[in-house]
């Protein structure tokens, strides 16, 4: 019996609105949660207030996790009343909260109008040389359009991009979950690291993701170190170049194959941006003027698929591919999902693969699988608490049809 703790909202199918949707047109309010400092400064000037109020309000929202303007005690009563009339601070609705026996936490959020769509966020705790680390894996889209063959999220299809308040709301809620019983004056930020590795391709929702990361780095909000915010991409090359100009954060590449033929199968966007272009973009990202610690290397993510990309020749090809790219390699044991066409590489195979890379001088780690008891491990970010999306159902039907054809041919 699983020891995960599941806390559900009272009405799974209720009509509570998300952060980006007002209760009614007449009651429409401006949601301040996803606004950057520059946006908040303009907002306050537009309503006839001094722009320094932006920093004050940001601190109350993102450092003390306050949603009631009446609690913002360093702001005049008149301004608080004004904000109450025209503004709100509203994160996406939490449908379920899952707490794993290993400390992993997962939130299922409802976003969009009416019953909306579901997205998931996972927090993974760990101990390192700096102490207790809490890494939050944030989603950027509802579903994903890239359809990587080993990823369960992609099999849901793509529905829409998340808004900045829906993205930053995931970080807000994760922090608040540790502080909700703590007096406001004693609250502190708990999440130490953010990885944009959840549902969706972050670089295909570029503006909203960029705005959200600026809030993460802002000292008036979460004040996170640039090296503690990581964006993971499957390889949208033009946007990698744009990212290098717009913000300094750590970059991770969902590589998963050491040659174009195999990567075309596993990560279809490779057909548009093949490996030579992707590696060159990574080199440009690292070499960008103004390089700081966040850009000293690129993290390479490599899911280990039994008999597919885990053979000795694949390790040798990977060494050749990465020889001129400062990188750290993270080997990820595959997490099977229903109808998945792959299996997980054996532990011995993964260790052997790691040894080949380490012996060649690369820093190579094996990701510890966490949160399996709550379907929170990487590749399992699917909405299992509600009906499958229409596209997921269609995909399952196609799988069944293919299996039937194979049986009849056999």
UniProtKB/Swiss-Prot annotation:
PANTHER family per UniProt: 23S RRNA METHYLTRANSFERASE, RADICAL SAM CORE DOMAIN-CONTAINING PROTEIN
Protein function: Specifically methylates position 2 of adenine 2503 in 23S rRNA and position 2 of adenine 37 in tRNAs. m2A2503 modification seems to play a crucial role in the proofreading step occurring at the peptidyl transferase center and thus would serve to optimize ribosomal fidelity.
UniProt keyword list: 4Fe-4S, Cytoplasm, Disulfide bond, Iron, Iron-sulfur, Metal-binding, Methyltransferase, rRNA processing, S-adenosyl-L-methionine, Transferase, tRNA processing
Enzyme class: transferase
Domain Radical SAM core: 130-373
GO BP annotation list: rRNA base methylation; tRNA methylation
InterPro entries according to UniProt: Aldolase_TIM (IPR013785), Methyltransferase_A (IPR040072), RlmN_N (IPR048641), RNA_MTrfase_RlmN (IPR027492), rRNA_lsu_MTrfase_RlmN/Cfr (IPR004383), rSAM (IPR007197)
GO CC terms in record: cytoplasm
Binding site for [4Fe-4S] cluster: 144, 148, 151
Protein name (database record): Dual-specificity RNA methyltransferase RlmN
Organism, as annotated: Acinetobacter baumannii (strain ATCC 17978 / DSM 105126 / CIP 53.77 / LMG 1025 / NCDC KC755 / 5377)
Cellular localisation: Cytoplasm
GO terms, molecular function: 4 iron, 4 sulfur cluster binding; metal ion binding; rRNA (adenine(2503)-C2-)-methyltransferase activity; rRNA binding; tRNA (adenine(37)-C2)-methyltransferase activity; tRNA binding
EC number(s) per entry: 2.1.1.192
């Amino acid at each position: 019996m699983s020891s995960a703790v599941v806390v559900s909202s009272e009405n799974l199918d209720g009509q509570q609105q998300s952060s980006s949707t007002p209760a009614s047109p007449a009651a429409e309010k401006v949601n301040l949660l996803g606004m950057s400092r520059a946006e908040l400064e303009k907002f306050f000037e537009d309503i006839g207030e001094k722009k320094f109020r932006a920093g004050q309000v940001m601190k109350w929202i993102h450092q003390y996790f306050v949603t009631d303007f009446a609690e913002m005690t360093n702001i005049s009563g008149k301004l608080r009343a004004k904000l109450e009339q025209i503004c709100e601070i509203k994160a996406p609705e939490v449908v379920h909260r899952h707490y794993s026996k290993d400390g992993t936490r997962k939130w299922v959020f409802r976003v969009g109008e009416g019953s909306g769509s579901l997205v998931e966020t996972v927090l993974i705790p760990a101990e390192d040389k700096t102490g207790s680390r809490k890494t939050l894996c944030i989603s950027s889209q509802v579903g994903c359009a890239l359809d990587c063959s080993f990823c369960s999220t992609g099999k849901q299809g793509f529905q829409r991009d998340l808004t900045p308040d829906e993205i930053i709301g995931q970080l807000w809620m994760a922090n608040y979950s540790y502080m909700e019983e703590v007096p406001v004056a004693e609250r502190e930020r708990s999440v130490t690291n953010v990885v944009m590795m959840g549902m969706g391709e972050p670089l295909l929702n570029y503006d909203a993701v960029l705005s959200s990361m600026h809030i993460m780095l802002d000292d008036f909000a979460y004040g996170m170190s640039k090296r503690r915010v990581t964006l993971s991409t499957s390889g949208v090359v033009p946007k990698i170049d744009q990212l290098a100009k717009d913000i300094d954060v750590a970059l991770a590449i969902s590589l998963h194959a050491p040659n174009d033929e195999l990567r075309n199968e596993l990560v279809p966007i490779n057909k548009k941006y093949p490996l030579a272009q992707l590696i060159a973009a990574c080199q440009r990202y690292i070499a960008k003027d103004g390089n700081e610690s966040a850009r000293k290397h690129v993290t390479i993510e490599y899911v280990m698929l039994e008999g597919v990309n885990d053979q000795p020749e694949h390790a040798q090809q990977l060494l050749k591919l990465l020889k001129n790219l400062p990188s750290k390699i993270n080997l990820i044991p595959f997490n099977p999902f229903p109808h998945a066409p792959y299996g997980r590489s054996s532990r011995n195979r993964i260790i052997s693969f790691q040894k080949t890379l380490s012996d060649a001088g690369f820093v190579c780690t094996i990701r510890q699988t966490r949160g399996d008891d709550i379907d929170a491990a990487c590749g399992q970010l699917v909405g299992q608490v509600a009906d499958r999306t229409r596209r997921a159902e269609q995909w399952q039907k196609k799988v069944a049809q293919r299996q039937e054809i194979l049986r009849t041919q056999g």
